[in-house]
């Protein structure tokens, strides 16, 4: 495959975070059609759109945006080179002038919601330590701290009647719990509103137009399910049969239906429930990702994004009466042939303890009889991430270069129920590694797999697992590529922000009580076992997995006699990118550079 073709695929335009205005007749979204992510606004009736920003928004997106209540401005968060120390900005849709609202260069700030009278912004910030809720007064520019908790706040909504704010918090001894809280809009009268079970994760996704009902999601029965909570009667109405993970979304303006998302076997599809009768209305789409729960004015349309393994994302308007689909942003392939792309396959296999693991498999279209091909095992982040049957530029590049791609959703992944997701708690790098190794055993049963050419790669937790697998099961791997990965859990804890420390507590337990586990599951302590050549990629501005994670591993390799080099035994390759943080998939320039670097490595080493 030529460098030119790789670049064309890596630069297929992507759009992100479509968000309706308060009148529900326009949609704003990020789009990289120009080669850089910019902010756009489209009229849903005419489909006319205009570019709003010109370099003011981040290249690598890590935060969303909200509309002001008059629909004249959009408020977004921006960091510097991926360091995730966001400040808040407001851009006017007519003049395109940008105004900085907050300036906290060493802290994180994220928009949450706006007050219904348009006077205030609700936002999350770490400016006082832990991530808490604050309000910003647009007129006098005053900032008020609304909460001051020792654990992080998760999301918040301002009621339509301006009489309460709901938010997510956990005050339980059980770190894996999540409850719904409520307070007055000035921050007073804070209290727990709903806790279905100690240990369940309960959250709000929307408030009805009259302010009397909350759309909620909870996993108190195992699988996540959607419901409506009545603030007046305290009653909950649940929907679905709990056979699949389902997440609540938006409530229609007339309050008659709830739009949800169903996650099953690595696909996501919309489901509509009649709130009164509980009856389900499924919307039929091909396997893939059909995302979005936004309902337009007069409850006529859903605004959704569609993509599959062979089709990049497109933005559509789905008519709830006729079921017709109207494309708002079509697929932009340029002169790429759609037949070039390879369809995926969803497979299942048993792990060492009999647990069923789902995975996504790509194989080249034309495999000759008796041909044996190299395999790349691709590991997702999180560890609570999930691989879906969605379009992946890099997977298409790899499979069209003759690699088999295998993407397991190992224990700890989202999408398979709460019990499955919690199986790696205090067992990071244990059962999940066994699931991956069992996946390799499954691959070896396929007659087109070269058992001696198996590689592994991933980003974030996928980077950790690449480091970990290559030192704990060195005999399996011929090469590995770790991007923004973790090599030393204790060092990561020491360098983490308070809300990241809380997440590590959830995975490992508290450091002073479980320090031995942090040490025992760190690849840095087993480097002497490494046999496979490694590619290490890291962004110098990464706040989640700081650059020190890569540097200490590099130094340990050098200490043990390894050398930086592109060929030969006991050699590794090392790249620091000085213009990114924790990856940068939404940045086309980063995609091109990253794809070419990793592909070149595996073509040489595997």
Model region roles, listed by residue range:
Residues 1-3, 30-51, 72-73, 79-99, ...:
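Beta-propeller blade-edge and WD-like acidic-aromatic loop motif
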Residues 8, 51-52, 100-101, 145-146, ...:
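Conserved beta-strand positions that form and line the central face of beta-propeller blades
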Residues 410-606:
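Active-site-proximal cap/loop segments of hydrolase catalytic domains
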Residues 174, 200-201, 223-224, 246, ...:
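Flexible loop/turn segments at secondary-structure boundaries
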Residues 11-28, 56-77, 88, 104-124, ...:
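Conserved beta-propeller blade repeats
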Residues 331-452, 459-460, 494-502:
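Cap/lid segment of the alpha/beta-hydrolase catalytic domain
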Residues 1, 252-255, 274-277, 281, ...:
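Extracellular/periplasmic ectodomains of large secreted or surface enzymes and adhesion receptors
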